[in-house]
Structures are given as C-alpha cells and as structure tokens.
Amino acid sequence: MSNQFKILLFAKVKEVIGKDSIFIDLPLDESTSFNLIRKLKHIYPQISSTLEVSLLAVNQEYISRDQDIKINSNDEIAIIPPVSGG
C-alpha cells in the first residue's frame, strides 16, 4: 500500500515544473519528509539543486532540513524555494 501526497509548488520550482501542485506516491512505511524529497529529486532532477536550498512546510509549519518526520496523505505539504530578486 502507499500514500499519495499533494505537493504545493512555489516560485522557481513551480516555474520549472510548470504546475501549481503535483502528486507523489510513497509506500506507507517510507512516508517521511526525507523520502519525499529523495523521490522528488529522482522524478524531477531539474529541480534537485533548488530542493537542496528549499524549505519544506508540513501543515503550514517549516521543517528543518535535518529533521526527518513521518508524513500522512492528508498533510498539506509545500516546497518553498528561496526568494531572489531585488
């Protein structure tokens, strides 16, 4: 069995992928923030370097890059790339 996650995309990640959101499936026993990022990098290698410096928000709370948390299919998940410009 697996969980399906809706991932909200913003800024550069949204531009590169061309969508506001995407869906990712992860096995139930692998439904963690680290595995989600790993799978995103595999499916979308063109955003891999941006993901390295992006923030992950789960249910509107930022998750530390070194914190691997369990995620559920009903969680709101967002990838927040760094803001650039001037």
UniProtKB/Swiss-Prot annotation:
Gene3D superfamilies: 3.10.20.30. Keywords: Cytoplasm, Molybdenum cofactor biosynthesis, Nucleotide-binding, Phosphoprotein. The keyword DNA repair does not apply. It is found in: Cytoplasm. The modification Glycyl adenylate is found at residue 86. The gene is mocs2s. It comes from the Eukaryota. Coiled coil: none annotated. Pfam families: ThiS. InterPro entries: Beta-grasp_dom_sf (IPR012675), MOCS2A (IPR044672), MOCS2A_euk (IPR028887), Mopterin_synth/thiamin_S_b (IPR016155), ThiS/MoaD-like (IPR003749). The modification 1-thioglycine is found at residue 86. SUPFAM superfamilies: MoaD/ThiS. One of its GO terms (molecular function) is nucleotide binding. It comes from Dictyostelium discoideum. Heterotetramer; composed of 2 small (mocs2s) and 2 large (mocs2l) subunits. One of its GO terms (biological process) is Mo-molybdopterin cofactor biosynthetic process. C-terminal thiocarboxylation occurs in 2 steps, it is first acyl-adenylated (-COAMP) via the hesA/moeB/thiF part of mocs3, then thiocarboxylated (-COSH) via the rhodanese domain of mocs3. Acts as a sulfur carrier required for molybdopterin biosynthesis. Component of the molybdopterin synthase complex that catalyzes the conversion of precursor Z into molybdopterin by mediating the incorporation of 2 sulfur atoms into precursor Z to generate a dithiolene group. In the complex, serves as sulfur donor by being thiocarboxylated (-COSH) at its C-terminus by mocs3. After interaction with mocs2l, the sulfur is then transferred to precursor Z to form molybdopterin. This is Molybdopterin synthase sulfur carrier subunit. Belongs to the MoaD family. MOCS2A subfamily. Pathway: Cofactor biosynthesis; molybdopterin biosynthesis. One of its GO terms (cellular component) is molybdopterin adenylyltransferase complex.
